[in-house]
């Protein structure tokens, strides 16, 4: 997975503008008006939270590395830029993306084992017939044009740790922020290095007290980022004002000398703020009920 990102299919074929993503989704709404009216679904970010939590449950049963789960989330996003979710079984897509991601991230699982574990989690949505997963895998690979290598921000974060003298708490929080960005459209909009820099900035600027930041950063960051912290980010491009703390100043100096697009970093941070705001509306029960009704009514579990 160490291939050059700048020459990658991810950069050349799987980065979109916000406008293009909006056009794709609007086209789905226009083309599938009846399905959209019959089966309303929550905000896409709330669905992303639900899918992520289900992937984590599946991954824990097989001690799967975080990077494989992240790759699976990217596969799901890519697949749904080509397919209307209301004509699919999201549980099968999720399971298949997990199975394929494990192979690509060199932690493969046997297909029968994956199907068995998925059935133990979602018995009403996953058939014991392993050929269904095989068929879905073929569809997934086809829709992604066999472009399966995914570059993640985790690697850049590791490099920035020593360069910016990040503490273990800052690295842990930045790692959690990277985990959270997969719940948004950011993996389809920005390069991994921009996401990594955003995560470091958030960890350094908004860092709460020492703590354990495994999983999501939402609980510790939501309030800090919402309650005026964005002003400091806006000041990154401003030479006036009060002197920031030394660690923040070091980050600002590093950014000024780098070729990182500061505007893009700030846009990513704003997207994260929006995620943490909408997260307050999240209901696992609601997502499960709406998806379940859709799958069962349309017999997508067969």
Curated annotation (Swiss-Prot):
Keywords: Activator, Cyclin, Nucleus, Repressor, Transcription, Transcription regulation. Residues 53-142 form the Cyclin N-terminal domain. One of its GO terms (molecular function) is cyclin-dependent protein serine/threonine kinase regulator activity. It holds the Pfam family Cyclin_N. Its main location: nucleus. One of its GO terms (cellular component) is nucleus. InterPro entries: Cyclin-like_dom (IPR013763), Cyclin-like_sf (IPR036915), Cyclin/Ssn8 (IPR043198), Cyclin_N (IPR006671). GO terms for biological process: regulation of transcription by RNA polymerase II. It is found in: Nucleus. Belongs to the cyclin family. Cyclin C subfamily. Component of the srb8-11 complex, a regulatory module of the Mediator complex. Component of the srb8-11 complex. The srb8-11 complex is a regulatory module of the Mediator complex which is itself involved in regulation of basal and activated RNA polymerase II-dependent transcription. The srb8-11 complex may be involved in the transcriptional repression of a subset of genes regulated by Mediator. It may inhibit the association of the Mediator complex with RNA polymerase II to form the holoenzyme complex. The srb8-11 complex phosphorylates the C-terminal domain (CTD) of the largest subunit of RNA polymerase II. This is RNA polymerase II holoenzyme cyclin-like subunit. It comes from Aspergillus clavatus (strain ATCC 1007 / CBS 513.65 / DSM 816 / NCTC 3887 / NRRL 1 / QM 1276 / 107).
């Amino acid at each position: 997975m160490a291939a050059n990102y700048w020459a990658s299919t991810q950069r050349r074929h799987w980065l979109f503008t916000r406008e293009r993503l909006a056009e794709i989704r609007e086209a789905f709404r226009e083309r599938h008006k009846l399905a959209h009216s019959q089966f309303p679904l929550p905000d896409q970010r709330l669905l992303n939270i639900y899918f992520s939590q289900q992937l984590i449950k599946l991954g824990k049963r097989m001690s799967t590395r975080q990077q494989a789960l992240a790759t699976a989330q990217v596969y799901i996003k890519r697949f749904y830029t080509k397919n209307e979710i209301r004509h699919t079984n999201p549980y099968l897509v999720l399971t298949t993306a997990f199975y394929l991601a494990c192979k690509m991230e060199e932690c493969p699982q046997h297909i029968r084992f994956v199907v068995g574990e998925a059935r133990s989690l979602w018995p009403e949505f996953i058939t014991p017939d392993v050929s269904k997963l095989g068929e879905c895998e073929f569809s997934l690979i086809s829709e992604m044009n066999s472009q399966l290598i995914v570059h993640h921000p985790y690697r850049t974060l590791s490099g920035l740790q020593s360069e910016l003298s990040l503490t273990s708490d800052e690295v842990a929080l930045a790692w959690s922020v990277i985990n959270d960005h997969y719940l948004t459209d950011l993996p389809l909009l920005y390069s991994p290095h921009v996401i990594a820099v955003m995560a470091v900035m958030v960890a350094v600027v908004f860092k709460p007290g020492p703590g354990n930041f495994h999983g999501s950063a939402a609980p510790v960051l939501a309030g800090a980022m919402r309650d005026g912290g964005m002003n400091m980010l806006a000041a990154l491009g401003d030479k006036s004002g009060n002197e920031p703390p030394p660690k923040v100043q070091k980050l600002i100096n590093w950014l000024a000398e780098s070729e990182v697009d500061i505007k893009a970093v700030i846009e990513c941070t704003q997207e994260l703020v929006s995620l943490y705001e909408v997260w307050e509306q999240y209901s696992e029960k609601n997502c499960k009920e709406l998806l379940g009704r859709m799958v069962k009514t349309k017999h997508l579990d067969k």
